[in-house]
């Protein structure tokens, strides 16, 4: 069966797909942190079922931040611009709405804010207040370049970046 699909149809479903993946990854991530004492080893995404399912469809789920846990690849110019827009909204207490961009003819990129939650304070909160000395030592040992702390509850910690192949969206229409 042949069906005409508009760019609007693709973008609408891609935004919905990004929102669903982000919501499920966030749910699984928080559940795994709450289930573990300390949570440090649970703060990785790669083994979460929602991330593995997305990966099997060619969808890449990742996080970016100006305050990274480990020294990784610096943000590119587009990532810096998107991050700056979300940071601007956060500083002015504006609603931060997930967005979708067309990277090229074959790929879409979904962005959404990562907001500091109470469950994250034991590793990302204030040292000596939320982060225990034991956890501080463990973080220093495992993540010597860690900058992802001193966040207040409700603060912008980073962004979800989900790269979605258009063909995956078209298959779903």
Task: Mark where each language-model region is.
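Short Cys/His-rich local motifs and their 1-3 flanking residues in nucleic-acid-associated proteins
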Residues: 125
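Extracytoplasmic c-type cytochrome modules immediately beyond a signal peptide or single-pass transmembrane anchor
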Residues: 1-119, 128-173
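Short, cysteine/histidine-rich loop/knuckle motifs that typically chelate Zn2+
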Residues: 122
């Amino acid at each position: 069966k042949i069906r005409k699909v508009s760019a609007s149809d693709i973008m609408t479903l891609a935004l919905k797909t990004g929102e669903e993946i982000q919501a499920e990854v966030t749910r699984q991530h928080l559940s795994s942190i709450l289930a573990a004492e300390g949570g440090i080893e649970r703060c990785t995404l790669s083994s979460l079922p929602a991330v593995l399912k997305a990966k099997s469809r060619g969808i890449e789920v990742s996080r970016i931040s100006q305050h990274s846990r480990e020294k990784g690849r610096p943000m590119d110019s587009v990532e810096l611009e998107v991050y700056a827009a979300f940071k601007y909204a956060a500083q002015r207490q504006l609603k931060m709405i997930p967005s979708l961009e067309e990277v090229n003819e074959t790929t879409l990129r979904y962005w959404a804010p990562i907001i500091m939650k109470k469950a994250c304070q034991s590793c990302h909160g204030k040292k000596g207040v939320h982060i225990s000395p034991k956890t501080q030592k463990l973080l220093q040992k495992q993540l010597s370049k860690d900058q992802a702390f001193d966040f207040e509850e409700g603060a912008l910690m980073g962004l979800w970046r989900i790269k979605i192949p258009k063909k995956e969206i078209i298959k779903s229409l």
